[in-house]
Amino acid sequence: MLNGEEVSEEIRQMQVSGYVSEVSANKQVRVEMVRQQQRMGQTENIVMDGRDIGTAVFADAQVKLFMTADPKIRAERRFKELRSKGDSVITLEEVFENLAHRDYADTTRKESPLVRADDAIILDNTELTQEEQLNFALEKAKPFLHVNP
């Protein structure tokens, strides 16, 4: 959400991906983002996706999944996603290079680098479907879910 407007599609565009690591490396941006993300999770359970969620934002979360996959597979998936949304200009090689650049920048940045939390469960989804990934995550989270009848 941005100023009350749904922007999930827009933030997944390649032109945004090219700047994410650079902006995220800024200490002031990191501090404010962590503050806002923590505020969102204060009053209710939340599922959050991000490269430092389990280490900086919700270090005490009951369930943490560290998702990984073969870089080539990640690039192919991202390429297909972009193509399905009408981006016919980008090449698979450009997507691969973008992901490699982001991974390097995020793992080597000073503020909240991308690392696996010691207590995170590794989910290598290289050969898993989305449904298999969801089932894995639900199985790990189920003991912590409190559902009101």
Predicted regions, residues:
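Generic surface-pattern signal
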Residues: 21, 25, 100-104, 146
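Small-molecule kinase domains that catalyze NTP-dependent phosphoryl transfer to phosphate-bearing small molecules
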Residues: 37-43, 51, 55-56, 60, ...
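A ubiquitous short alpha-helical element
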Residues: 2, 63-67, 123
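Glycine-rich phosphate-binding loop of ATP-dependent small-molecule kinases
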Residues: 1-14, 18-19, 130-149
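Short, glycine- and charge-enriched coil/turn segments that flank and shape catalytic ligand pockets
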Residues: 83-93, 145-149
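ATP-dependent NMP and nucleoside kinases share a basic, alpha-helical "lid"
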Residues: 8-11, 17-24, 28-85
